[in-house]
C-alpha cells in the first residue's frame, strides 16, 4: 500500500478508535475524501478491525448511514450481540 494511503488508513483507524461516526462525519473531521474512506472501511472490515455499531441518520448529510468504530471494546460488544442474534433470532 502506498505510504500516503497507509497514512490515511492509520488516521481513519485512529479517529474511529475515539469516535463513533459515519464516513461523512470522518471526512468533515479529518479531511480525507469519502471515496478513500469507503475503501479503508472495506479493508478494516475484512480484517475484523471495524464494525458497524448502528444504523442511523448522518449528522452531516441527514441521510441514512452506518455509524462505525474501530474501538476493540466496541467491536467485541457488537460481535457478541451478533452472535446472540444468531442463537436467538
Where do the language-model regions lie?
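Short intrinsically disordered terminal tails
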Residues: 1, 80, 84-89
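Short alpha-helical segments that sit at the start of domains
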Residues: 1-15
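Short, cationic-aromatic polyanion-contact patches
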Residues: 5, 53-82
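Surface-exposed alpha-helical segments enriched in charged/polar residues
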Residues: 14-17, 42
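Short capping segments at the starts of secondary-structure elements
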Residues: 17-25
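A short acidic, leucine-rich amphipathic alpha-helix
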Residues: 25-31
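Short amphipathic alpha-helical interaction segments
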Residues: 32-46, 54-57, 63
Amino acid at each position: 500500500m502506498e505510504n500516503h494511503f497507509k497514512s490515511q488508513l492509520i488516521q481513519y483507524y485512529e479517529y474511529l478508535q475515539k469516535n463513533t461516526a459515519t464516513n461523512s462525519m470522518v471526512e468533515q473531521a479529518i479531511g480525507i475524501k469519502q471515496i478513500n474512506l469507503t475503501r479503508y472501511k472495506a479493508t478494516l472490515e475484512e480484517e475484523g478491525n471495524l464494525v458497524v455499531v448502528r444504523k442511523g441518520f448522518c449528522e452531516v448529510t441527514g441521510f441514512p448511514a452506518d455509524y462505525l468504530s474501530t474501538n476493540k471494546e466496541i467491536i467485541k460488544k457488537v460481535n457478541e450481540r451478533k452472535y446472540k442474534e444468531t442463537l436467538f433470532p
